[in-house]
Amino acid sequence: MSNILMTLAEERELTTPDHFAVKLKVDDGDCYDFSDELQALGHEVFFANWDDLKGREFTRMFHDNAKAFIKPPPLSTMDLIFVYKMEGFYFDLPRFFQMVETFAAAAPLVVNDPRTIRHNIDKRYLLELEREGLLVPPTRLFDETVRERLAKGEPIVLKPINGERGKGVMLMKTPAELDAIEGHEHEYLAQDFIPGVREGERSFVFLGFEYQFGFLKRPSNPEEFRCNESQGGTAVLYEPTAEEMEFALRTLRTYESFGCPIHYSRIDMIRSERGPMLMEAELINPSIFARYFDRGEDFGKKIAAYFHGLLKS
């Protein structure tokens, strides 16, 4: 029997003494699917709100087997820590990194791996993948060529180097629009705008290198280019073509070659005239939309089996 801790975004107003309320109802279902399956395999499962980490220990912890809040056991007693649903961590990166380092020092297994988290949180990984030959939208650090290209009528997408769920991503069409980020230009990557993104992103979920399921994310309206759920995007089930599957696996293999272990991931791509084009490799706590497709229970079994295998190996 192993101890497994999951960090979750909590809806404190809805939490009761015998129920840890996850921020979104859809996520609540996913989290409990994982937990039920892990318990069926003989593991002890604990939930914690990352806001409750003080120093190197949590001040509150929910023991899901017992359906009760308990005195938090030391993190050193955890065999696996799953950095899962977390709200707003991009707005407090120093504390987030401190948490990840605390987990790495305390537990033999952290998913996703701290090395992968540290690397993936910086969107400049897209430049590295591009250098390795993967097709991505032409990407560069913000420089004066951005203003020059906008003056020529070429739209540019600005993407925060540290950001999540499409927040802060902007489509710029004129130099005057750059006033919105004046003084913060160094915090952005600049990408060529690829019109094909309006057709939607193809997203594929993996555990390790094993494909789980895929879905097509679409923007909320013809004028929107972001497909993120937080921006009103929708999703439908979608199965990858052979070319898309090979591209996704190549992306993961390339990322692993950077010294970043691969566990739980989502690879986002679009179609282009040159073939699949990578938009993001989500390797921190990717949204998987499982409940939207009634895949929560099935995926819960698979992720529980995956964690069980990690703990046995």
Predicted regions and their residues:
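Active-site nucleotide/adenylate-binding loops and adjacent lid/helix of ATP-dependent enzymes
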Residues: 2-17, 24-31, 98-200, 242-245, ...
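A short, polar/proline- and glycine-enriched secondary-structure boundary/capping micro-motif
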Residues: 17, 223-228, 289-292
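Conserved N-proximal alpha/beta basic substrate-recognition cap immediately N-terminal to
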Residues: 23-138
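Anionic group-transfer/hydrolysis microenvironments
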Residues: 51, 86, 161, 193-194, ...
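Structured loop/turn residues at beta-strand edges in well-structured enzyme cores
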Residues: 76, 134, 152, 260, ...
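Conserved residues at the C-terminal ends of beta-strands
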Residues: 84, 142, 217
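Phosphate-binding site of ATP-dependent enzymes
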Residues: 165-258, 270, 277
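ATP-dependent carboxylate activation and anion-phosphoryl transfer catalytic cores
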Residues: 242-313
